Amino acid sequence: MTAHASIATPGGISLATGRDVRLASRSGALTGSTAGFAPGFVQANLAILPAKLAFDFLRFCQRNPKPCPVIGVSEPGDPTLSSIGLDLDIRTDVPGYCVYKDGVLVDEPADLKAYWREDLVTFAIGCSLSFEEALMAADIPLRHVEKGVKVPMFRTNIACVPAGPFAGPMVVSMRPMTPANAIRAVQITSRFPSVHGAPIHIGLPEAIGIKDLSKPDYGDAVEILEGEIPVFWACGVTPQSVISAAKIEYALAHGPGMMLCTDLKNSALATG
């Protein structure tokens, strides 16, 4: 989750809004991470499944709202999600995608035109980029942003509530903070329940099954300085991990760090 120096492609195409990023992805002008682009706009994780599994997955998300906050669901076979974006096409409007067959990653295409099916249902799931913007606006430093690396993520011993074939441990992201900033972060992120909300754990990583903070399961390791404590949030990698573990016959998702940029504003997600 790196912050980009400018909100434009090398070719000068603006990436200031969610629609700008979608159109740049559609044209092939944007092929990498969306972090730092479309500031102020909500970015979403994608989980795309056959309709026969959609109800079970929706129940899984409803039972596990911290790691799986749903912000949009499509009709079967419909690649649009007008509730979160004008002229949005799920098949083309993300810089890169993942294709899973029987739980195994088999391709990482630039678009889903060759992989789209009429029985597919898209779930857009809230992303921590939204609350990170609020933390940075409050002058709370984020080490992974400062270092230009991906946030470290870990599988825990916290079991998600199962639904149908979907079950498994919660994945969390970790951000080191001073105790004072951790308290402020709880206050700030509590106002964003649709993008993971408040931390689920602070300190003592071993209490949630994490043995070594220098060896994340996903993302990149970051240093924890003297006087800092690890702060853990439920993470949107959880649904992808659970889908893969379920070994369902066919599923699609966004590529790592390549989110769906919506027309929703981060400020509109805040409560209270």
Curated annotation (Swiss-Prot):
**Family annotation (Pfam families):** D-Glu_cyclase
Q: What is its EC number?
A: 4.2.1.-
Q: Which SUPFAM superfamilies match?
A: PSTPO5379-like (SSF160920)
* Transmembrane intervals: none
Has the keyword Nucleus been applied to this entry? no
Q: Which GO terms describe its molecular function?
A: lyase activity
- Keywords linked to the UniProt accession: Lyase
Q: Which domain of life is it from?
A: Bacteria
Q: Does the keyword Lyase apply?
A: yes
Name the family the entry cites.
Belongs to the D-glutamate cyclase family.
Q: What is this protein called?
A: Putative hydro-lyase AZC_4080
